[in-house]
A protein has these predicted regions:
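Acidic, glycine-rich loop-and-beta core segments that form the ion-binding/anion-interacting portion
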Residues: 170, 192-195, 207-216
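Short beta-strand-initiation
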Residues: 196-197, 243
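Charge-rich, well-structured scaffold segments of protease-associated domains
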Residues: 32-185, 190-193, 201, 219-220, ...
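Active/ligand-binding-proximal structured segments within catalytic/core domains
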Residues: 1-39, 112, 214, 224-236, ...
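Short, compositionally biased low-complexity segments
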Residues: 11, 66, 201-208
């Protein structure tokens, strides 16, 4: 479903992720127990996740179960959203938020996105906040569902040993009467002016490590240089066999040091993440800056580029 945290208002922060949970709580023809039982009977590997821009429901089954799995996934796209289920699941979401805030980097990722994007919707938290989720009502979720879960806003992807003709026939029979309208999304590019004072400190008692997150503008999902950005991030900051890995991780100076390229519709970022002992923070940040300066001035070697291309291509194939 082409909907996520960036499609939410401040008042509805967290509703996309909350709705993802609710889609497994029953439909007009299935109870929550039926949904889980049928997934288990098919021997499926299934799950769901919500991001800034999409909510994904997926299911891997043997070929003989493909139509049954399609029927089930289509059905949960039309949940009942009962008040009783809403009230129960709200407590689950609040516990998830508390757990997220109590583990590394202790809300630092969301805080960094808010600091970078400011009022832009890409700074919205996927989970929402305890305050926004607590205040959310079932009618608000119902209105959001009818607005965002339009047939025109859903994409079905099927791969493997499939019967394409039967899948299309079943979709037309089961989903042909779904409400269909255009869903709007503001994809205006966001760019920020570098600000050395743009820093937020979060203090957490009892921690033994320092978690540092840095964000700067990067290519969007449709920019011509998005692949170059991804390859550069892989060379410089992949979690294995990158410049940061050999300089900071393999030497034992830092516990974790990566650079990621994250592309969205209309905007993008490079996100750097460093985890180290507090007493090493200043020296490691200086070294991090030295490495980025070297990358900027000297570029990359052909061997680094070849390795990164092989790694990225392998990830694309294996991920699918």
């Amino acid at each position: 479903v082409r909907t996520g945290a960036r499609d939410e208002s401040i008042e509805l922060s967290g509703v996309s992720h909350f709705l993802e949970h609710m889609c497994f709580k029953g439909t007009p023809t299935r109870s929550a127990e039926d949904v889980n039982r049928e997934l288990d009977e098919m021997g499926s590997q299934s799950n769901a996740f919500t991001s800034q821009e999409q909510t994904v429901y997926f299911c891997s089954v043997l070929p003989e179960h493909q139509l049954s799995a399609l029927n089930l996934l289509s059905d949960i796209m039309r949940p009942t959203l009962r008040q009783s289920d809403f009230d129960t699941e709200k407590q689950v979401i609040l516990e998830e938020i508390a757990k997220y805030d109590d583990q590394p980097p202790y809300g630092g990722h969301d805080a960094a996105l808010v600091k970078h994007f400011k009022s832009h919707p890409l700074g919205n938290s996927v989970l929402g906040t305890a305050e926004s989720v607590s205040a959310l009502t079932q009618p608000q979720m119902l209105e959001y569902f009818h607005r965002q879960y339009s047939a025109n806003n859903l994409t079905l992807a099927v791969a493997g040993k499939i019967d394409f003709v039967k899948i299309v026939e079943q979709l037309e029979a089961e989903c042909g009467d779904w409400n269909n309208h255009d869903v709007q999304r503001d994809t205006q590019r966001y760019s920020t002016t570098p600000d050395t004072a743009n820093i937020t400190n979060i203090h957490k008692n009892g921690t033994h490590q320092q978690y540092i997150i840095q964000i700067t503008d990067g290519p969007s999902a449709t920019d011509a240089d998005r692949s170059a950005g991804q390859l550069m991030a892989t060379i410089f900051g992949d979690d294995n066999n990158s410049r940061l890995f050999w300089d900071l991780i393999d030497t034992g100076k830092a516990e974790y040091a990566v650079l990621e390229s994250q592309e969205y519709q209309g905007s993008g970022i490079f996100l750097g993440y460093l985890c180290c002992p507090p007493e090493s923070q200043e020296s490691l940040l200086q070294r991090y800056c030295q490495l980025t300066t070297k990358l900027h001035e000297n570029g990359v070697t052909q061997q680094e580029l070849d390795t990164a291309q092989a790694k990225v291509c392998s990830h694309i194939v294996l991920r699918s």
